[in-house]
Every structure is written in C-alpha cells, then in structure tokens.
Regions:
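Predominantly soluble domains enriched in secretory-pathway, periplasmic, or organellar proteins
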Residues: 1-261
Length: 261
C-alpha cells in the first residue's frame, strides 16, 4: 500500500500500488501535510497545517482515532513554512515529536493517550527544520535556525553540538535514522546534497543534485533518495565527491562550527 496526504480533500488516501486505485480515504484535520508511519504499518500520524493539529490514524480499521491540537488556532495556520513539516517517532513508538506552530519549540505527544506532555527541553532557537531519535541511547537530535542540538535521555537537558557558520546557501533536509548524519541541500542550478557528521560538525559527503525538493534516507542510512530536477535520484553515501572541494568553494564554504567550550 501507498499512503498519501490529500491537501485539498483533508484526508489520508490509501492507494493500491498495483492498480493505482484509492481504496480508502480517511478524514484528517485541515490541510494535512507530513505523514509518519509505525514500523508495522498499522498506525499513522498526520500533521495538519491549517488546523494546527496532529491526526492519529488506525490503518487496520482505516479510521481516524484522534486529533491532538498543537496550539490555539488563530486563523493563520502553518502554511507560511515551505516544504513539509518534520516529525520524529521514538524507537518504542510511544512518543511523537512535532515542531510547535509559529514558535521555536518542540511539542511532545504521548501516542498511547494522544495527549501533549510537558517538554521543557524542547525550546528551540527558531524554526525546527529536522529532528530525530538516536536509537542506541535515546537522544533527540534537532536542527534549528542556529545549529544542531541534542537532548539527552537521562536528564532531558538540551545542549548545542554544532553552530552554523555559513548556512545562507543551504536548507536542512533530514537526519539519518541512526541520528549520526544531517543532510543539507544547496540552492541554485549547480546544487549539491551535503552530508554532515553531526558529532564532528564536519562535511563528510558531497553529491551533485540540482533543485532538490524532497530527501529521505534509507533505513540503514547508506542510501539517500532525493527528488530533484531530473526526477528521483539514489545517492550512495560512500560515493562522494571530494568534500574539501565544497569546503574551499567561495560560494559554499564551511557549513558548521563546533561551539567554543
């Protein structure tokens, strides 16, 4: 099955891949955007732009289960942000993280009770552009307007790992499933996908791709799939151009800096 949000119909469409037929249309909130699935494919959570909410969906019964409001709706919604909104599901699938609508913060949702939970560590510094969990230690990694931060599982304290040095020509597109790598995309015709080692704050991969508007990692993080100017491209993490070439480039240069202690 293929699952797709219908922005105008306010629904999640269930599509038979073999026939291309829409076999179910499940009601969501207003103007659904991002979608995240449970690993067994029985549940889905949909971010709704205009109603500023998350819809919980049962994919076995094809039913809308609950709507979780993110903030009081003021009529403006989240439609001013380009691209799909990011979400992150914890390894045990009991916690869903979503960016707050219109504020620099992260909202934590209990997927069992469908309730928001207090999350003081979720204060970001501007729009959250990517986030994810590190399965090995439960840390949360997120990128915002100032750089990359982590929230430790043991004490729920946030700390800055890497600050942006020169990010005006890049957009943050995603974090690898293991939480070790961050993918950025450069603007312009001669574009690149840039792979950053989060811990080291260093560029480790550069891949040519122009006009990228969507990016996803494979489950093992070794492949990067991008929707670019010429269609869908599959990139191999190990098959990179020389990273030093992009670091020395007068237009692009260094991306990130390790903060001073």
């Amino acid at each position: 099955m293929l699952y797709a949000t219908s922005f105008e119909a306010n629904a999640l469409s269930v599509i038979n891949v073999a026939t291309g037929e829409i076999i179910q249309s499940i009601t969501t909130g207003a103007h659904p955007d991002s979608l995240i699935l449970s690993r067994d494919g029985t549940k889905a959570w949909v971010m709704n732009r205009t109603s500023n909410s998350v819809s919980a969906i049962d994919l076995v019964a094809y039913q809308h289960v609950a709507d979780i409001p993110l903030e009081k709706y003021d009529g403006t919604g989240m439609s001013g942000k380009p691209g799909a909104w990011v979400m992150a599901l914890s390894p045990d699938e009991k916690t869903l993280l979503v960016p707050g609508a219109g504020r620099g913060n992260i909202v934590r949702i209990n997927t069992i009770t469908h309730q928001k939970e207090d999350f003081p560590a979720g204060d970001a510094r501007g729009v959250v552009s990517a986030m994810g969990f590190r399965p090995k230690n439960g840390e949360i990694i997120f990128a915002d307007s100032q750089g990359i931060s982590r929230i430790r599982a043991e004490d729920q304290q946030a700390s800055i790992m890497t600050q942006w040095c020169s990010r005006s020509v890049y957009s943050v597109e995603g974090i690898s499933p293991d939480g070790q790598y961050l993918a950025l995309v450069s603007y312009g015709l001669q574009g690149y996908v840039i792979l950053l080692n989060i811990n080291a704050g260093q560029i480790i991969g550069v891949y040519p791709a122009s006009y990228v508007n969507h990016l996803r990692f494979s489950a093992d993080g070794r492949k990067i799939f991008v929707m670019a100017k010429n269609g869908l491209i599959q990139l191999d993490r190990e098959s990179s151009l020389d990273p030093q070439a992009i670091i020395r480039h007068p237009q692009y240069g260094d991306v990130a800096c390790i903060p001073e202690p």
